[in-house]
């Protein structure tokens, strides 16, 4: 027999695991609805012209590209083939790719459907994305993102609302977190005062790795990217900035006083914190100057969330993008959004055993199959139970009761109904409680009430 496997960085999920994952999705979805967001979906495939050049050079390398259909090799330029010109070859043999995230597809969606959309457009999306990353703990090549974005509004109240959503979702999931926020305008201001404006992408890419690789490695990378030693020395106080959120803001106002864009970013951060001070939040919200988020399209506030109890990397990221739809021809449309990493949240809940009882959606009663006469009696009963929302099954084969009870046990079905000739004659059903092994009879007209009560008591 062929040895079967799945690609590295991907996973199968059993029914039990899907119950847990749906608990996560349902929790996040319910909070999104609470704040007025509406759901959309976009294709797994996007044209490479939509995807390439928008994430930055490093992240472009992580795109999964799909070979063109048919005899695509015959259309390749022989010179590029013989000279191993991979970048040129890619354009000739691949026109489509798997989406890297849900933000660029959103920008494409907004531009294509702008005449159908009411702005501000509050959308959420729960779908898988793919990245050709090196698989490791907490890092997958296929994973689900749960995004919420507000497009068509530059109000900082949107940032405040998104932080409330973050706080509420993780509270409902019982996960303790730290919420980090920063502003790309502040980072631009820092690059400006150290005279390295043209190297802003290199600086922010390196800064974003500070938590992962440490200060020494970040400084080495900055040097390799051509940042001057003098500029790197000027960056050190920013890397090491400590104190309360307000103290950091006050300190930076003095340092960045000659940078209008830097001051603008500080004013935005300060406004967000002032509004948050009016609202009770359950988790720590920290102004972290080293938070950069590697994606090129962020222009204002940026978010990142980490779990305090499990070392697994970030479980949420996001930020404001003022120019994202510009690349598709629609200007002056600001947006801001967040993205929950559902797969890392799934791993955290597993590790901390934080899942509630998820059996409420399972089958509540299995009817044993004892033959044709019993089946004819059971089918109308099944219909009545399902009609009022009680999950019920009939075993499809007339086989040994032991086998049917084993099926109920393995599928965690709490009740088994036995209908023999006596039950049919008396219009009753014998119920076996699989949890306590007790057994009792119940009149047919009392069956629905019994299970509705059982469901409420779960």
From Swiss-Prot:
**Compartments it resides in:** Cytoplasm
**Primary site of residence:** cytoplasm
State the InterPro entries in the record. Answer: aa-tRNA-synth_II, aa-tRNA-synth_II/BPL/LPL, Anticodon-bd, Anticodon-bd_dom_sf, His-tRNA-ligase, HisRS-like_core, HisRS/HisZ, HisRS_anticodon
BP GO annotations: histidyl-tRNA aminoacylation
Which PROSITE patterns does the entry link to?
AA_TRNA_LIGASE_II (PS50862)
One Pfam annotation reads HGTP_anticodon
- Look up the EC number in the record and give it: 6.1.1.21
What GO molecular functions are on record for this protein? ATP binding; histidine-tRNA ligase activity
A single GO cellular-component term from the record reads:
cytoplasm
The reaction(s) annotated as catalysed by this protein in its Swiss-Prot or TrEMBL entry are: tRNA(His) + L-histidine + ATP = L-histidyl-tRNA(His) + AMP + diphosphate + H(+)
Q: Provide this UniProt record's keywords sorted from A to Z.
A: Aminoacyl-tRNA synthetase, ATP-binding, Cytoplasm, Ligase, Nucleotide-binding, Protein biosynthesis
Cite the Gene3D superfamilies for this sequence.
Anticodon-binding domain, Bira Bifunctional Protein, Domain 2
- Assembly information from the UniProt record: Homodimer.
Family of this protein: Belongs to the class-II aminoacyl-tRNA synthetase family.
Q: What is this protein called?
A: Histidine--tRNA ligase
Q: Which organism is it from?
A: Azobacteroides pseudotrichonymphae genomovar. CFP2
Provide the organism lineage as a comma list.
Bacteria, Pseudomonadati, Bacteroidota, Bacteroidia, Bacteroidales
The gene name on file is hisS
């Amino acid at each position: 027999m062929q040895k079967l496997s799945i690609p590295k960085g991907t996973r199968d999920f059993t029914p039990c695991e899907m119950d847990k994952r749906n608990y996560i999705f349902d929790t996040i979805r319910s909070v999104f609805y609470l704040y007025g967001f509406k759901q959309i979906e976009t294709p797994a495939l996007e044209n490479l012209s939509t995807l390439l050049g928008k994430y930055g050079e490093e992240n472009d390398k992580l795109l999964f590209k799909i070979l063109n259909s048919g005899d695509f090799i015959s259309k390749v330029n022989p010179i590029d083939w013989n000279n191993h010109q991979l970048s040129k070859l890619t354009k000739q043999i691949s026109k489509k790719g798997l989406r890297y995230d849900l933000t660029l597809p959103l920008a494409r969606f907004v531009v294509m459907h702008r005449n159908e959309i009411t702005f501000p457009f509050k959308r959420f999306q729960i779908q898988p994305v793919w990245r050709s990353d090196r698989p490791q703990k907490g890092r997958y090549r296929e994973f689900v993102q749960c995004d919420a974005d507000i497009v068509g509004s530059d109000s900082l109240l949107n940032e405040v609302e998104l932080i409330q959503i973050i706080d509420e979702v993780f509270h409902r999931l019982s996960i303790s977190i730290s919420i980090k926020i920063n502003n790309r305008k502040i980072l631009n201001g820092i690059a400006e005062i150290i005279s390295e404006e043209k190297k802003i992408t290199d600086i922010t890419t390196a800064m974003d790795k500070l938590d992962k690789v440490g200060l020494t490695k970040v400084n080495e990378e900055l040097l390799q990217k051509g940042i001057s030693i003098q500029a790197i020395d000027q960056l050190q106080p920013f890397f090491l900035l400590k104190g309360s959120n307000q103290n950091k803001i006050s300190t930076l106002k003095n340092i960045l006083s000659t940078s209008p864009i830097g001051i603008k970013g500080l004013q935005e951060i300060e406004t967000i914190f002032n509004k948050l001070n009016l609202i009770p939040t359950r988790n720590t919200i920290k102004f972290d100057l080293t938070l950069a988020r590697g994606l090129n399209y962020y222009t204002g506030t940026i978010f990142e969330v980490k779990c305090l109890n499990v070392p697994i990397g970030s479980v949420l990221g996001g930020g404001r993008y003022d120019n994202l739809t510009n690349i598709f021809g629609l200007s002056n449309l600001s947006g801001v959004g967040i993205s929950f990493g559902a797969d890392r949240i799934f791993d955290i809940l597993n590790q901390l055993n934080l899942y509630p009882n998820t059996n409420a959606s399972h089958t509540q009663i299995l009817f044993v199959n004892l033959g044709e006469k019993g089946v004819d009696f059971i089918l109308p009963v099944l219909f009545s139970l399902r009609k009022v929302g009680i999950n019920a099954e009939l075993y499809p084969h007339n086989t040994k009761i032991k086998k049917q009870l084993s099926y109920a046990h393995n599928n965690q079905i709490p009740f088994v109904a036995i209908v023999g000739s006596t039950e049919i004659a008396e219009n009753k059903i014998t119920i076996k409680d699989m949890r306590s092994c007790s057994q009792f009879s119940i009149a047919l007209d009392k069956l629905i009430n019994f299970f509705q009560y059982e469901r409420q008591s779960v």
